[in-house]
Amino acid sequence: MTSPKPWARSAGSCQTQRAVRTRKKECREEGESDTEKGPAASSASAQCSFPKRVSFFGWAGALDSSGGTTRAMDEEIVSEKQAEESHRQDSANLLIFILLLTLTILTIWLFKHRRARFLHETGLAMIYGLLVGLVLRYGIHVPSDVNNVTLSCEVQSSPTTLLVNVSGKFYEYTLKGEISSHELNNVQDNEMLRKVTFDPEVFFNILLPPIIFYAGYSLKRRHFFRNLGSILAYAFLGTAISCFVIGSIMYGCVTLMKVTGQLAGDFYFTDCLLFGAIVSATDPVTVLAIFHELQVDVELYALLFGESVLNDAVAIVLSSSIVAYQPAGDNSHTFDVTAMFKSIGIFLGIFSGSFAMGAATGVVTCHVTKFTKLREFQLLETGLFFLMSWSTFLLAEAWGFTGVVAVLFCGITQAHYTYNNLSTESQHRTKQLFELLNFLAENFIFSYMGLTLFTFQNHVFNPTFVVGAFIAIFLGRAANIYPLSLLLNLGRRSKIGSNFQHMMMFAGLRGAMAFALAIRDTATYARQMMFSTTLLIVFFTVWVFGGGTTAMLSCLHIRVGVDSDQEHLGVPDNERRTTKAESAWLFRMWYNFDHNYLKPLLTHSGPPLTTTLPACCGPIARCLTSPQAYENQEQLKDDDSDLILNDGDISLTYGDSTVNTESATASAPRRFMGTSTEDALDRELTFGDHELVIRGTRLVLPMDDSEPALNSLDDTRHSPA
C-alpha cells in the first residue's frame, strides 16, 4: 500500500485542506469526554477546534448553535446534496473512461481497414488520454467557495486519521494527499482531478490479473519450450543485469544533480536500483501485436513473448526485494553484504512461493473440474474457472507473495491441464472471456497513462534525470541482449542472428507493468520523480519504437508471413533429423513424466494410472483415474497443440496435402532400436487441428500415392533389428 504523504506545513501550521479527505463523519453528544474517545484518538493524532462552519474539499457542515433540531436538518440537507453531487461526478468520471475505450475500439476497427504505418492503436489510445487529461486540467474549473475552506488547524504530525472538534461535535477526516503551496486556492479543481486518478491498487488487483493470466493461458508452449533456456536467461539474468546497469547510471546522474543543486529531496542508491527494476519491466505489446499480424518468424516471436512474460514477473519480485533491503545500523541506505544476501533470499523465496501457489491453485481447479460434473453446467464451470484463476492473484498478495508470478503460472497450469477437463463450450468461453478482459484492461491502462500526465498532481520532472534515464534504459537493454545472445549462441544449434538481436534490442518497450510499479508508491520526492520519468519513457518507447516496428523489420530483413505450424518445412533434412538431439534430456524426461503420470492424475487425458503406476498402487490408481480416461485409452485426446517437436522423420498431413519429412520405413528400425526409454516414449504431435498419436495404435491418414502408409510405423516398430 502507498504510504501516506505528510501534510504540508506553512509557518509551523498545518494546512489541513491540503491533506484531508472527508470519508465519513461521526457525531457525538457534547457531553462526551475526551477520555472516552481514547480508542478513536489512537487512529488520529490530533483534535482541532473550528468555527461553527467548516469544510474540507467541498464538504460543508453547517452547524447552527441556536438549536439542535435545525442544525441536524441543515446537516442532512447538505449531506444529501453532497452525496448526489458526488454520485454525479463519479458517474461522469467513469463515463469518460468508457468513452475513451469506445473511441479506442472504433480506432482499432478503422486501423483494420487502413493501417497507419507509423502509429499503432495503443499509441493512439495514449494520445486520446492526453487530450482528455489536457481538457480536465486546463479546460474545466470548479467554482471555489472560500467559505468552505478553513485554515486554522495546527498539528505537529501527519496522522492518517484526524478527529475534528466542531462546536462540541467530532468529525473524522482521513489523509488523502499533499497539495503544493501554489495550488491552495484550487482545492475544488484538485479534488476533481483526484477523482479521475485511480487508487494504484486498482491496477494491481483489477487490471493486471487478466493481462498476466491471459499471457500464460494463451502461451504457445511448443515454441516457448523450444527456447526455454534462452528465455530464462533473458528474463532472469538479463533483467538483473539491466536493473544494475540502469541503477548505476542513475546513481551517477543523481550524484551530478546533488553537486549542481538540482535535487530537492533525498535520493539514495537503493532508490536508483528500484528505478532500474521498474523500467527493466518490458512490455512489447505493440510490437507483438504487429508481429502477430505480419506473422513474423516464430523463433523471434517466441523469444520476445517469452522474455516479456517472465520479465514482468522477475521485475516485480526484484523491486520487492530491493524495497526489503534493510542493512543493520542506523543508516538504511549503506551497502551491507548480509542485507544483500538477505534480499537475494527474499527474491528466491517470493518467486518460488508465488510459483508454487499459482501451480497449486491450478491443480486444485484441475481436480474440481475432473471429479465433479460441472461440465454439464457450462455457466457454472466457466464461473468457477474464472473465480479460481482470479483468486490466485489475491491469495498470493494476501500471503505476502507476488500475485503477478502466481497468476502467470496458474494460467500456464490451467491451459495445460484444466483446459482438457472443461466442456467444449467452456473451453471457448474461457478463452474468449480472458481475451476480452485482456483487451479492455490493456487499452484502459494505455488511455489512463495519457490522462495521468495531466491529472497526477505531484509530478517531478528533472531534465538531467530524464535524459540520464533514457540513456540508461538503452545501455541496460544492450547489456541484456548482446552479451547474453553471444553466450547463448555457444550452445544453440539454431543461432540467434544479429538481426534478431537488433530487433530484440529495438523491441524493449515499456508499458503497463512499468507504469503500475511506478504509480504504486508516489509518497516521496524520489518516487514522484521515478513515476514522472517512467511515464515519459513509456510514451517515447510506445510511440517511437512501436511505430517504427514495421520499418525496422524491413530494414533488418526479418521474415514475415511465416506459418507457425509449417515453419519447419523450410528446414533442411539434416537439421530436422537433429531436432531430437537438440531437445534437452531434462525436458524429454519431463514430457514422459507429464504424459504418463501428471496428465492422467489431473485430467481425463493420457493413459489410465492403472497402466502406468506399479501394481502396488492399484487402489490409489483406480481412485484417481477418471472413467473418461478408460474410454479414451485407445484414442488419447490432447488439446495442447503446442508441445515440443522431438522427431522430424514422421509423415504429417496438413489439410489435404501431405508433407514428406522422411521415409518412415527406412528410418523406423534405426530409430526404435536405440534405447528402451525412447521405445517407451509416447509421442503426441499436434499441428493445427490435426492430431497424430503414436501408441501402438493403427492410424490411417490421407496420404499421397507416392508415400508409404503411415501405419507401417506399427510394423517397423516391432520388427527385429
Swiss-Prot record:
Q: What happens when the gene is disrupted?
A: Mutant mice generated by CRISPR-Cas9-mediated gene editing display an early neurodegeneration of the cerebellum and a more protracted timewise degeneration of structures within the cerebrum. In both the cerebellum and cerebrum, lysosome deficiency is an early pathogenic event, preceding autophagic dysfunction. In aged rat SLC9A6-null brain show deposition of amyloid-beta and tau.
Per the record, membrane topology reads: Multi-pass membrane protein
Keyword Transmembrane helix assigned to the entry: answer is yes
What's one Pfam family here?
Na_H_Exchanger
Disulfide bond positions: none
Membrane-spanning ranges? 91-111, 123-143, 196-216, 231-251, 272-292, 298-318, 344-364, 388-412, 434-454, 456-476, 499-519, 535-555
Q: Which residue windows are coiled coil?
A: none
Matching InterPro entries: Cation/H_exchanger_CPA1, Cation/H_exchanger_TM, NaH_exchanger, NHE-6/7/9
User: What family is this protein classified in?
Assistant: Belongs to the monovalent cation:proton antiporter 1 (CPA1) transporter (TC 2.A.36) family.
Please describe the quaternary structure of this protein. Homodimer. Interacts with RACK1; regulates the distribution of SLC9A6 between endosomes and the plasma membrane.
Q: What is this protein called?
A: Sodium/hydrogen exchanger 6
Origin organism of this chain? Rattus norvegicus
Q: Which gene encodes it?
A: Slc9a6
